[in-house]
UniProtKB/Swiss-Prot annotation:
Protein name: 3-dehydroquinate synthase
Residues binding Zn(2+): 184, 247, 264
GO cellular component, one term: cytoplasm
Subcellular locations according to the entry: Cytoplasm
Keyword hit for Secreted: no
Associated pathway: Metabolic intermediate biosynthesis; chorismate biosynthesis; chorismate from D-erythrose 4-phosphate and phosphoenolpyruvate: step 2/7
Cited Pfam families: DHQ_synthase, DHQS_C
Keywords: Amino-acid biosynthesis, Aromatic amino acid biosynthesis, Cobalt, Cytoplasm, Lyase, Metal-binding, NAD, Nucleotide-binding, Zinc
Organism domain of life: Bacteria
Positions annotated to bind NAD(+): 71-76, 105-109, 129-130, 142, 151, 169-172
Cofactor section: Co(2+); Zn(2+); NAD(+)
Catalysed conversion reaction: 7-phospho-2-dehydro-3-deoxy-D-arabino-heptonate = 3-dehydroquinate + phosphate
Length: 366
């Protein structure tokens, strides 16, 4: 068992990583007998895990209610959020309740935002079931729902009281979802840790093959990096913005194509190549390192090009709604070397468009 602490003073919390955690009620600390829980999951995961987790909690004396939501990025919406609020109010649940987010990034983000809002804030526990949520979205307190005009535009910074990462969940994860999570894994190597990027180059095939020893190390390292960044910059005023590598471009893909058509990690993978291409055109990132990134993404089963049906000009309106835009100026996270990145403003729209165009299936720069 691995345990990592996200250090935020009195709001610090543990990330527990191991196989078989769902079998032990102690995994769901700080829950105690007699406390009330609302377990939030989706229609895909409910048949796999809901009854088991509920039984373990009830055997420990926890009073459990549940709400089962539709599955998919397109349901990370205000309308679906209202279903959670209605379930809480109908029981009813008070300020002493705890929400448990049993699912991937959509369930985690939506449940966390519900916890932040319900009666002005109740406890919640993240129980991520996808690789993407285990290495990224469950840690750090970013909670949100989408709006038709932009991803994660309605949300709050609100930290969980714990994160429970049961490695056994990955055994039921579809291959496409595993690859989507690997995009965020690769991101950490590009922006923060050259040695980890090299480790990924040597071990990506083992990760794709669901080698549990490799996955355990990979998840632990990503959580360590994320915890360090969040402890230093919880509300994304500086360092934490680097975690958005590829997201300004990738969120444009998700919004334009329709949420869920491209998985989040797929869009971020293409976005990271676009960011690297932009950095190269600015003279701060080598062509050799772009090729290393592309090769690793391809081995992970990820795209390195944007959607063919999205013309470069369709990206910019979405990118200008990005949360990093200040005073109308586009600010991009760009790599400067493998293991290093920066937030850079003042990049001309023509250069951004040219970089996107270079990442079309028939237009990749040689």
């Amino acid at each position: 068992m691995e345990r990592i602490t996200v250090t935020l003073g009195e709001r610090s919390y543990p990330i527990t990583i191991a196989a078989g955690l769902f079998n032990d009620p102690a995994s769901f600390m700080p829950l105690k007998a007699g406390e009330q829980v609302m377990l939030v999951t989706n229609q895909t995961l409910a048949p796999l895990y809901l009854d088991h987790v509920r039984k373990v909690l009830e055997q420990a004396g926890v009073m459990v209610d549940q709400v089962i939501l539709p599955d998919g990025e397109q349901y990370k919406s205000l309308a679906v959020l209202e279903q959670v609020f209605s379930a809480l109010l109908e029981k009813p649940h008070g300020r002493d309740t705890t929400l448990i987010a049993l699912g991937g990034g959509v369930i985690g983000d939506l449940t966390g935002f519900a916890a932040a809002c319900y009666q002005r804030g109740v406890r919640f526990i993240q129980v991520p079931t996808t690789l993407l949520s285990q290495v990224d979205s469950s840690v750090g307190g970013k909670t949100a729902v989408n709006h038709p005009l932009g991803k994660n535009m309605i949300g709050a910074f609100y930290q969980p009281v714990s994160v429970v990462v049961d490695l056994d969940c990955l055994k039921t994860l579809p291959a496409r979802e595993l690859s989507s999570g690997l995009a965020e894994v690769i991101k950490y190597g590009i922006i923060l840790d050259h040695d980890f990027f090299v480790w990924l180059e040597n071990n990506i095939d083992a990760l794709v093959a669901l080698d549990m020893q490799a996955l355990a190390y990979c998840i632990r390292r990503c959580c360590e990096l994320k915890a360090e960044v969040v402890a230093a910059d919880e509300r994304e005023s500086g360092l934490r913005a680097l975690l958005n590598l590829g997201h300004t471009y990738g969120h444009a893909i998700e919004a334009e194509m329709g949420y869920g058509v491209w998985l989040h990690g797929e869009a971020i993978a293409a976005g990271m190549v676009m960011a690297a291409e932009t950095a190269h055109r600015l003279g701060q990132f080598s062509r050799e390192d772009i090729e290393r990134i592309k090769a690793l993404l391809l081995r992970a089963g990820l795209p390195v090009c944007g959607p063919q049906e999205m013309a470069p000009g369709t990206y910019l309106p979405h990118m200008m709604r990005d949360k990093k835009v200040l005073a109308g100026e586009l600010r991009l996270v760009l790599p400067t070397a493998i293991g290093q990145a920066e937030v850079r403003g003042g990049v001309g729209h023509d250069m951004v468009l040219a970089s996107i165009a270079a990442c079309f299936p028939d237009g990749m720069s040689k």
